Each structure stands twice: as C-alpha cells, then as structure tokens.
Amino acid sequence: MIKTVLLFINLTLVIAQTPDKRGYIIKVGDNLPEFVMDFPDGSQINSVDLLGNVTMLQFTASWCSVCREEMPHIEKEIWKIYKNIGINVIGIDRDEPAEIVEKFAKEIKVTYPIALDPRADIFALFADRNSGVTRNIIIDTDGKIKFLTRLFDPKEYLEMKRVIHGLLENQFLEEKQTLVAQKQILKELKHKRTTDQNISTKNIEQKLFLLERKLNLKARRLSYAEKLL
C-alpha cells in the first residue's frame, strides 16, 4: 500500500514537471513560485513582494532576436501606459552578466527593470531549462498565473494586453470597494466623536482624500488605456 502511494506521488511530480508543447512546466491557475530576483544595481526583490499588484514577468536575453522585436512594444504599450496604475513589469534575462543586461536595455531603449538569471534557475521554475526565451507570464494580485505567452505572436500579444487591462480594472474595483468601506468607518468614527471628543479623524480624512484622488486619476488612466487596446 505504501509503495503504491509513493509511486502515485512520484508519477504526479513527474507529470507536474513535464513540459507542455511550448516548454512550460507551469499552467494558468498555478501559484507564482517563490524566488528572489537580483538586479544589476545590486537590489533584490522577492516574488512574494509582487503580491497585491498585477505583475508581468518577461523572460528575455540579448541574443534573442524575437525578444528585441517584442520588448519595445512592451515598453510603449504596457509599461508606459500602465506603470502609474499599479503594474509590475519585470524582465528576467537568462544566462548573461549584469554588464551585458545593462547594455542590452540601453540598446533597445526599455526602462522597465530587468533582473538577472545567470544560471536560468528562475526560468526553470516556469519552463523546461532547455527551452527558449521570449515568454511572458501574467500574474494577478493574489499570485495566480493568468496568462502565458510564447514568442511574439500579434494575436496572442493583443489578448495578453486585454488580460492585463482586465486584471487592472479588477484591482481598481477592489481598491474602490476598500475606499467605500473606509469611508463608512470614518462616518461611524465621526458619529462616535459626538460622545468622545478624544477621537480625532483628521489624519483618516486626509488619507482617504489622497486615496480617492489617486483612484480618480487611476480611473482616467484606465479609460485612456482602454481606448488604445
């Protein structure tokens, strides 16, 4: 019985790590793996820190001609449009040192951050280590993988942009609901202040005012971005 269970577990692990026809070992609906990204400037980001925002991970390399074709589109049509709305766009360069990665970014004129993956260990969490780059992974605010691309197919790229926009709209609605809930709490505090003069709501009011202004700006930017899709 124990041998049967162990065999089943081993088979499950093998199936889970078997690449699909595009080389992916993860699929839509999976959780974002935990890993640490190092950047050419010496900074680090843990994948856990990405939660709470829509995230796009873009696997790339300077020797990849398809990446060079796709990345200016990502810069112009995703990063520059959505970076002030609440998206993480991070390139992950495999098998290359920091100086090459920095030169690469300048050559193709991208400003979103590019992390280092010198041994392709991060890449191998998502796809077969021996498969090619030019891959985008779209992750929602809860760390669920929502979309996967391979190479630079115009139809798939457009669908990816639509998925990103939809996720950002959902993120905006969640933030708006939070604001409504916080306003209700403020209202209750103001009511209590009639009996307890020690309760101060000034700081709360200021924070909610700034949040509302930020959300109004985000709504206008989302509306503008939708027209570009």
Which residue ranges define each predicted feature?
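Sec-dependent N-terminal signal peptides
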Residues: I2-L13
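N-proximal helix/coil linker or "cap" segments that precede and/or mark the start of modular domains
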Residues: I15-E34, L51, E175, K190
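Non-globular targeting/processing and membrane-anchoring segments
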Residues: L32, E169-L229
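A short beta-strand-turn-helix
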Residues: E34-T55, F126
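Hydrophobic beta-strand anchors of alpha/beta hydrolase catalytic cores
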Residues: M56-L57, V89
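Conserved redox-active cysteine motifs that mediate thiol-disulfide chemistry
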Residues: F59-K76
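Conserved segment of the thioredoxin-like fold in thiol-based oxidoreductases
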Residues: W79-A120
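Thiol/disulfide oxidoreductase modules built on the thioredoxin-like
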Residues: I108-T111, P118-H165
